[in-house]
UniProtKB/Swiss-Prot annotation:
It comes from Nitrosomonas eutropha (strain DSM 101675 / C91 / Nm57). Its cofactor is Mn(2+); Mg(2+). The keyword Kinase does not apply. The keyword Chaperone does not apply. Endonuclease that specifically degrades the RNA of RNA-DNA hybrids. This is Ribonuclease HII. The gene is rnhB. It catalyses: Endonucleolytic cleavage to 5'-phosphomonoester. It is an enzyme of class 3 (hydrolase). Residues 32-219 form the RNase H type-2 domain. It is found in: Cytoplasm. GO terms for cellular component: cytoplasm; ribonuclease H2 complex.
Amino acid sequence: MYCSGHLIRLAGRLEIKTSGVVVREWIHPEGKAIYGVDEAGRGPLAGPVYAACVVLDSCYVINGLADSKQLSEKRRASLAEQIKQHARAWAIASASVEEIDRLNILQASMLAMRRAVIELMPVSNALILVDGTHVPQLDYEVQAVIRGDSLVAEISAASILAKTARDAEMLRLHEIYPIYGFDRHKGYPTRVHLDAIRLHGITATHRKSFAPCAEKSTV
C-alpha cells in the first residue's frame, strides 16, 4: 500500500519519504488508515509555515512521541530521523511568506496541510486527523483533534517533522539575515527580534501582514 523511496519535492529540494503506533488516550477507529497532520510556525513574524502528514507503522513503535513544543531540539531531531526511517509514509510541505500575507496565516496553514496530505495520495479508507480546531478542505474524511499532538501518535509525529523542517529553514535564513537572530528565536516575536526590526527594518522573509512588521521598511 505504501512504498519506501518515493520522492517529495519541498521548496525546490528533494526529500525521501520512507516506509509506530503509540496508543495514548486516542482509540483508532477500526478499519481506518490514520494520517496525522500538524503545522509549525503560525506565530512567528518571519519565515514560511510548515506542515507534515505521517502514517505510522503498527509493527514498529517509536518511543517518546509527543508534542514537538515539549521536546528539546536534540530529542526532536532524533525522533524526526526515526519517523523518516520507520513511518510507513510521510510528507512535509510549506506555504510561503507571500502566501501567508495574501491569504492570512490560518488559510496558509491549511494550504500547507493540504499540500502535505495530497503528497501522500491517501487510500480510500483514510481518516485524516488534524491537530487543533480547524481542518483543511480535502476530499477525504477529516477530523480535528484538540490537543491531538499530545493524544495521537501520528499527529505527534507530524508535529515533530513540521517543527524540525521549519527550524532548519530558519537556520538557513539566519545565514542570509544574521542580524535578526533567526538561529535563536526561529522568527518568533522575542525582544531580540523586535529590537532588530526596530533598528534594521524588515526583510523579504518577514510577514508584512503581521502587526510588528506592517509599517516597517524592507532592508
